[in-house]
């Protein structure tokens, strides 16, 4: 088995990947917010509303298709934003992340487990009772749990990115076509 230093280094790498995902998701949410603000801050909102009104009043097959596609792009943008936000929500329920008898349930590393101690003295006693083998298992458990958290975050980030950018591009294309058609 790897030693403490090796395991701590692996844990640090996993934590860095989680921080990376949080940073990029925050940046993407900011860009999404700025883009939506620009659309509604200038005269684009008037053009969008007049285009939608025109398509609603002049019902034809293509106008109905246009409105349905427009609704889908708005839903895509909203869903993408939801998934980006979801990638930022902390996942701290160890039982949901991994349910294995080998996982350390009373971690001295994981903040949520540490907080279950009623006071500092009880936590300190728990630290003193921890053997080297228990500590290595605790670090290994945290590596596994952090990897699961990281994987879940990046899945949410990736789908949020695709849906929000795809929705924005689709919306821009549809509005351009709707305005000139």
Positions of PLM-derived features:
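Cytosol-facing regions at membranes
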Residues: 1-27, 34, 42-181
């Amino acid at each position: 088995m790897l030693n403490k230093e090796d395991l701590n280094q692996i844990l640090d790498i996993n934590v860095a990947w989680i921080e990376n995902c949080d940073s990029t998701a925050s940046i993407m949410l900011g860009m999404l917010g700025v883009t939506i603000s620009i659309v509604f801050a200038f005269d684009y909102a008037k053009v969008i509303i007049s285009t939608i009104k025109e398509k609603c009043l002049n019902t034809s097959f293509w106008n109905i298709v246009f409105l349905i596609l427009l609704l889908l792009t708005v839903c895509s943008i909203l869903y993408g934003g939801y998934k980006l936000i979801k990638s930022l929500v902390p996942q701290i329920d160890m039982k949901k992340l991994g349910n294995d008898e080998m996982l350390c349930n009373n971690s001295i590393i994981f903040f949520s487990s540490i907080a279950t101690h009623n006071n500092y003295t009880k936590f300190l006693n728990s630290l003193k009772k921890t053997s080297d083998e228990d500590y290595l298992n605790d670090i290994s458990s945290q590596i596994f749990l952090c990897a699961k958290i990281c994987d879940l975050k990046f899945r949410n980030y990736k789908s949020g990115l695709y849906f929000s950018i795809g929705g924005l591009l689709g919306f821009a294309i549809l509005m351009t076509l709707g305005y000139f058609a």
